Amino acid sequence: ITLILLITCTFTLTGCRNQTTDSGFKENVEIAWDDVKDDFDQIDQDVENDTSKQDVKALTQTILDGYDKIKEGITQDNQEEAKKVYEAASRLEYIEKNTDQKLSSEEKEILELGKKTKTLMMYYYGNGEGVFQDAVDDVENGIDRVKNFTEEKWNDFKDKLE
């Protein structure tokens, strides 16, 4: 009986990380949210305590550069890149929540990329809610918006946030 319970528990614990979820995320979760939660909570806390002005263009570029490296899931090999992407996303989200400037719909979408990226990353850590493909679409649409932002628009946006 002990052996059966041990086998059942082992199968259940290892099997959970490899199942397709109802959300549609089909990749293996190599690094669970519980394994990184404290680090990411610290990133969020550091962002809130940092009063320096952030370069929104540089933050979005960090997400663009890192997204291709993490979009298939987060592994030991790309975990550091994932932290950079998460920090940039957290900073964008913080700016979005704390700006009192009147922003255009395009500028709001740029800042919303932070929250959308963090939402998508929850799936990669096995903690996503909702439909996975919707989260992917939200991030990829946000990335397209960033790619189509002109230098003039970036300069205007930067001026508003200073």
Predicted feature residues:
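Sec-dependent bacterial lipoprotein signal peptides
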Residues: I1-G15
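Immediate post-signal-peptide N-terminus of mature secreted/exported proteins
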Residues: C16-K83
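Low-complexity, polar/amphipathic intrinsically disordered segments that mediate membrane, lipid-surface
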Residues: R17-F25, A88, D156, K160
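C-terminal amphipathic alpha-helix
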Residues: V36, F40-T51, S105-E162
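Polar/charged low-complexity regions in secreted precursors and cytosolic/nuclear IDRs
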Residues: L64, D68, E72, Y94-I95, ...
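Short, solvent-exposed, charged loop/turn and helix-capping segments
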Residues: I74-L111
